[in-house]
């Protein structure tokens, strides 16, 4: 089974892609940025973007019947690797125990400071 999903109330995609794709019991969440889902506004503050990005992921996961505890893998992209410790502290707010596997990469992105995608497992 493969199903592309758009979640009502989630931030609009910045391109031609689904919020997530469900394949069997795996949920592949597309890369999310820190845009406010109601206004599309993007804060210029790193911490605000990180929190909003993780909230956007949480909204998508809840829309398909998962939560942050169901995430098994995260890929994080930061424009400024020197902010890793700050990123990590905020990340721990959303994954306080048994965090998923994670890769964090420094890269250049137009206009956003952080992007995160993830894979979650649908509850049985």
Map each language-model feature to its residues.
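N-terminal presequence-like segments and the immediate start of the first folded domain
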Residues: 1-72, 78-124
């Amino acid at each position: 089974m493969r199903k592309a999903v758009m979640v009502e109330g989630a931030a609009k995609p910045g391109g031609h892609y689904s919020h997530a794709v469900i394949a069997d019991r795996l949920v592949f969440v597309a890369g999310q940025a820190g845009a406010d889902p109601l206004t599309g506004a993007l804060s210029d503050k790193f911490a605000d973007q990180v929190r909003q990005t993780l909230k956007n992921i949480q909204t998508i996961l809840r829309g398909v019947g998962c939560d942050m505890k169901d995430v098994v893998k995260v890929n994080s992209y930061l424009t400024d690797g020197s902010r890793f410790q700050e990123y990590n502290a905020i990340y721990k707010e959303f994954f306080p125990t048994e965090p998923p596997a994670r890769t964090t990469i420094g890269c250049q992105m137009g206009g956003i400071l952080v992007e995160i995608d993830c894979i979650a497992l649908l509850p049985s």
